[in-house]
Amino acid sequence: MPLVGAVAAPHSHLQLFTRPAENEKYKSDVQKGRNAMFALREQVERANADTILVIHDDHFVNFDFRCYPPFALLVGQEAKGSGVTDPDTIEQITGATYRKYEGKDAYQSAPSGIPQHMANWDEHKPYVYKVNTDLSVRLLKGLLEREFDVPFTSDGTMDGEEVLTTNFLNPKADKRVMLLFTNGYVPPLPWPKRCYRLGQAIRQILDEVDDRVLVLATGGMSHYPGTPLYGYVDEAFDKNVLALLASGKGSKLADFTPDDLMHSGNGELINWVITSGICGDVKCHVLDYIRLWHIGLGYVYWEL
């Protein structure tokens, strides 16, 4: 069977480091997040995939208001990205950066694709991921045949969040990738029922290939970046989603509306909905749910 598993994980850098002034409870929660990520890494290694299909919402890196598609496929030869993924290195960098800007009202924005707290450091690595171009093109054509008019691009950048999760879970970077960009930020969002059907179509296509493919959905859970609600977390919504997935009712995610996702701070959940469509109503393993000050973090995997 070519589809060898799926995982869903946050892409927030805050799951891997603590600020100098944080209390012991917060540090303990961050450590739980690290432990969950290491457990997911073991699942990725155990799956022994050839290719990772990364489903990730674009953070205004590849698209903007001139064109912000609900979905887009990368069909180029490689994907570039920058970022630091080692927790101890992140801890060192962020601690020094907080001290550097302590008491100041403004600080320099980061270059595209590099997390802001790493902008003035030379330690960040450039990553170049080899794309499984043949399979990406086959997926594109298969989706068009199934009446999903998915845009494509031959030039794609992996932003810092995408690099964080992808490289942490595959530190050897020894697997080719396929990149499906989504719009989890800019209303109107794609309808979850459409996302679920997209996942089903992807599964049909992957079932016809010989490549061993692992699906990686990044993002979430509840958070409200760049809004007055930043800091509020809809824990009840998050835990309901995880309960549905754990009970093998992932198809119920298709019943949500875009307003449900936006009001609960879960625009990025569309990546999980697509993955649920790929996996079907298979019970997933929920490793943990962690509430940090600004975000709910969910860690799950499917054995297929």
Please give the residue ranges for each predicted region:
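Short HxH-centered metal-ligating active-site micro-motif
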Residues: 40, 47, 54-59, 205, ...
